[in-house]
Amino acid sequence: MAIHEECGVFGVMSTKRENVAGIAYYGLYALQHRGQESCGIVVNDGGVFSSYKDLGLVSEVFSKDTLAHLSSGNMAVGHVRYGTTGGTTRNNCQPIEVNHQKGKMALAHNGNLSNALELRDKLELSGAIFHTTSDTETIAYVVTRERLVTPSIEDAVSKAMNSLEGAYSLILMSSTKMIAARDPYGFRPLCYGQMSDGAYVIASESCALSAVGAEFVRDVLPGEILVFSKRGVESRKEHCDKQKRKTCIFEYIYFARPDSVIDGVSVSKSRVRAGEILAENYPADADIVIGVPDSGLEAALGFSRASGIPYGIGLIKNKYIGRTFISPGQNERMDQVIIKLSPVKNVIEGKRVVLIDDSIVRGTTSKRIVKLLREAGAKEIHMRISAPPFLHPCYYGTDIDSEENLIACHHSMEEIAEIIGVDSLGYLPLENLNQLVESEDYCAACFNGVYPTTIPTDLRKDRFERKLSERMGVAK
């Protein structure tokens, strides 16, 4: 697999002063799959903020000592990051903290603004000074600007949403309140729950609620603003129903953890269904079905059930390294495949194998996995992909930045099969995507090129940071 989502957000608001940093720590641990470059936690203790942020995994950044650095409090917001806008630097670690005339706030954001550069230009012209190359800081400053002329932080967020374009699921913590907001399309997931002691928990995925013992309440609606305070939860829906829901379909195929439920749809069931559809559309005469860990496993199970071909564990994942897109260079990605996956020879040797994976982007990772299976003695390899071919860039928070890097833009399915070294290849048909979520309310722009929002003609993943670097005279 060679694709990555960008972030996970987590927030907790307790009814009493306690170790909210510890709760946030476990919540971020459950969201680690959404971002592995950096992480951070900001704690609010009666309006006094303390924070710790750094590059690395949750287990690397936080220890007993670093958690002890964070005071007890009644609120905390946390973030795990994989950068799709802005570089991998400590300055870009989230949550972003801002002090302003009416108070302070900490902001954690999952998504990608398509108009970030334009907003930043306007803010700089009005005197704003930026310290990062992340679009999250842009959101923070837009909210801050509105906060100076509005009576409440929730009013400021609502006003700011009129200016924001693209994907954003965010958690904002002020001195006295916590805000959860989701863009009007609902591109990225966001939900909340409640713990037995009354504490509220907000997270990118429901799996993080379960990890801290919170009971799922519901998803944040597209366009909705939830205000958590001493009075409870207030819902503001002035931005709801402005657009048709367009949740990213790839959340179900790959990004989300299989035990999560997004907008009422089980991620695990979606993946099993994808495998069943593949078996119906691209059957194979084979001896065993295996999945590429982790997101290919449920689809492999579905293919096995629908085809009657036995399911087996043919690839073992080393769980102590990050996903392959964490490495910036192609050679590093290849090296990570070698240490990340190991074939089970006695399962594969002499067998005709159906290999299930969630996608092919460049083809680099798939080619190496196929080579591993050949070396383990696979007689035939029939690869099935639980998503349609990637043909277009994503501008809503996924690391697919240009068509030049997408193998399906340059080669036919037969040519791709030859390039990666498989005997046959089949993709999930585009027209069957709706069966994964039993709805048409999803974004599949990376597959069909139909973008729900207006996209600047020169927009690329690196456009935001590239333009800023040019201004600052930084060599790229």
Please provide the spans of the model-predicted regions.
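Short, glycine/charge-rich flexible loops or terminal/linker lids adjacent to PRPP-binding catalytic cores
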Residues: G308-V353, T364, L391-G397, D401
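Conserved short alpha-helical segments that host acidic/polar catalytic motifs at enzyme active sites
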Residues: M1-P222, V227-A286, V292, E380, ...
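Extended, hydrophobic alpha-helical segments in both membrane/secreted and soluble proteins
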Residues: V289, G296-F303, S307, Y311, ...
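Flexible loop/turn segments at secondary-structure boundaries
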Residues: T84-T85, N115, F187-R188, L209-S210, ...
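PRPP-dependent phosphoribosyltransferase catalytic core
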Residues: M161, T176, G213-E215, D219, ...
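Secondary-structure transition/capping motifs at alpha-helix termini
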Residues: A128, V149-T150, P283-D287, R305-G312, ...
